[in-house]
Amino acid sequence: MPNLRPLAIALGLGLATLVVTDASAAPKKKAAGRAPAVSAQCSDFYDATNAGWLKANPVPQTGATTALGQLAERTRVQQRELLDGAMKSPQGNVQQLLGDFWASGLDEAAVEADGSKPIAPLLTRINAIKKAKDVPASIAALHQVGIPVAFNFAPDIDLKALDRHIGYFMQGGMGLPDPAFYTRTDADTVALMGRYRNYVKQILALTGTKPADLDAESQAVIALETELARNAQSLAGINNPFNNYAPISTKELTSRYRNLQLDAFLKAQGVNDDLVSLSDPALFKQLDGMVTRIKPEQWKAYLRWRVGDAMAPYLSKAYRDAEFEFRGRVIRGETIAPARWEQVLDAINVAAGPMVGREYAARHLSAEDRRQAAVIADKIRETQIEAVKANTWMSAEAKSEAQAKLAALKIEIGTPLRDLDYSVQPMGRGSFGSNMLIASTWRHREEMKRIGKGNADRRWDVLPQQPALAYDIAQNRLIVTAAVLQGPVFNAKSDAADKYGSYGALVAHELTRAIDAKGSLVDAKGELRSWWTPADKTAWNLLGNRVAAQFSGYEFPGVKGAKVNGELTREENLADLAGVELAWKAYLAAEPDAKPATQQGFFRAWASLWPQQVSPNEAAQRLTSDTMAPGKWRTNGALSNLPAFGATYSCKPGQPMQRVETDQIQVWR
C-alpha cells in the first residue's frame, strides 16, 4: 500500500490517573500545629476538575482510556456515518467513489467470492517474468500501485532546499519490521522466524505455489529478504533523516545501477526531476547485482509473496486470517481483529484518506468554527511575538530571528490549502480488493506529484479527519485538522476562557516549537541554519533542566514506586508550560475585564484535555517510552508554575498547586 511518511506529528494522547500530590512542595509544619485545610483545587486540580470523568471511566484491563482518545473514537464514528451517507445517497463524484468503495468493503460475501481475483493481473505479470531484465519492470509496476518491493521510494523534504521535495531511494522490501530479525540467533527471534516462515507459506499457497514447492519457495523468499537485511541500516539509523540524505543526479543514478533500470522506474512513477536521494550505495549495488544473480523463479516467488502480503487485509477470509494471526497477534500484539467496518475504514484511509478528509471537513467544519479557530491562532501568534520581545533569556539576535519566523509562519485550518486531483478510475461495488488497488494507485500518483520545486506543501502529513494540532517545521506552518475542532479541544459556542484554555494552549504549545531548540535549526526563509547563540542554547537547557527536575519528583500513576522520567518528557513539559503561559496572556488581552469566576474556566479547560485511565501493563510500557508526562502532571505540573492560577483559586505559595516563587519556572511570562 502507499509508502507514506509516518504520521508522527499527530496530537499525543498521553497517559492516566492516580491521586498524587507534590509533597516536596509543601511547607514544613510544626508538630503541634494543625495544617489549615487546602481546597481541592489547590491540592490536586487534575482530580478536582476531572472527578466525574474519572468515575465514569474506570481503569481498563488493557490499554488506556483518555479524553482525547475518546475524541479520536468519535471522529471514526463520524467517518463511518459520512461513508454510510455516501453509499446511500452520494453527493458528487468523490462521494460516489467513497460510497462504492465503502459498500464493496462491507459486502463480505462478495469479498469472499472474489478470492484472489483482485490481484490476479499483478500475479499474471509476475508469472510472466522469464529473464533478469523482466524483473525491474515488475518492481516498477508494483510501486505504481502502491506496493513497494525490493526497496522504498517516496517523496520527502530536500534538506538543502526546504521548499522542494525530492524522491528518496531507501531500504525496504522486507516483510519484517526490523532488519535485525533476519540475522539474530536468540531463541525468541528463532521462534519468530519460524512463525514468519509459516505465514509466508500460507500466502504463497494462496497466490499459486503448489504444495510440493512451498518449503523451497518460502525458503527462497526469506533468503532474498535476508540478503536485503544484511545490507540495511538499523532502525535507529534509518530514522535519522540526515542518514538518508545523499543527493545524486538521475543521470548518475542510471549509470551506477544499470540492472535496476532506475531511469525507467522513475518514468513509470511519473517522476521527471533531475535529482533524487540515495544514501545506501552499497545496498543498491548489492540489489543491482541481485537482479541478475538471483534466478527469475526466486524473484517471482518473492514478488508474489509481497503482493499477497500487502493485499491480504483486503482480500478473502483465508488471506485476512493468515495476516492477522502473524501481523495482528505476533507483531502488533492484538488479541482480536477489529470489527469489519473498522477494517474497511482503515483501508479506505490508507488508500483514499485525502478524499475522506475533504468530505469530512465539508460536513463537520463550519465556516464559523474555522474563523474562530483562525482568530485565536493569530492572537496566540501575536502574543508570542510580544513575549519574545519581552523575555529575558533570549539574545537580541535570537529575538530578531524568532520574531521574523513567527511573522512568516503559515496557519492552515481544517484542510490543506492546496487540494488534490480527484480524477480516479471509476469504482464499482463488486470488488473491494480491486477498488483498493484503484485508490492506492491514485494515492501513489498524488504522492509522486509532490516531487519537485514548489510542491513541498502539497499535503499534510496528517489527514483532516484525524484529530491533530501540529507544527510543521519544514514548512513553518501550524496545522489544525478539521477533526480536532470539537470537544474537549474546541467549542465555538463556549466562552473565551474555555477556548483559550484548551485550543489556545495547544496552539501555543505547537507555536513554541517554531523557536525552541529544534525550531531554531530552521530560519524564517526555510533554510537549515542554527540561529541561536551559545548563550541561547545554554539558557534553554537550564530551563529544561529545571522542568526535568520538577517532573522527576512526581510519582508515575499506575506503577508502584516509579517516578516520571523528567528527562524523557522535558521538551513536551516545556512546551506545555509555554502553551499555558501564552494562552493565558492572549486570553487576558481578549477578555481584560473577566472576573475570577469566569477566568477559572481557562484552567478547567486545560485540565479537561488530559483525564486518562491506564491499565498497569500499559502504564509500565509508557513509563520508559512515552515522551508525554501522565495527564495528572501535564495538568498540575504546568499550572503550579503560574501565579495567575494561584490568584484565581486563592492558592497559597507552597501548596501543591502553587509552587513558591523561587521554584516557579517561566518560559514566556
Segments (PLM) and residue ranges:
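Intrinsically disordered, low-complexity linker/terminal regions across diverse proteins
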Residues: 221, 256-259, 277-284, 338, ...
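Cleaved targeting-peptide boundary
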Residues: 24-37
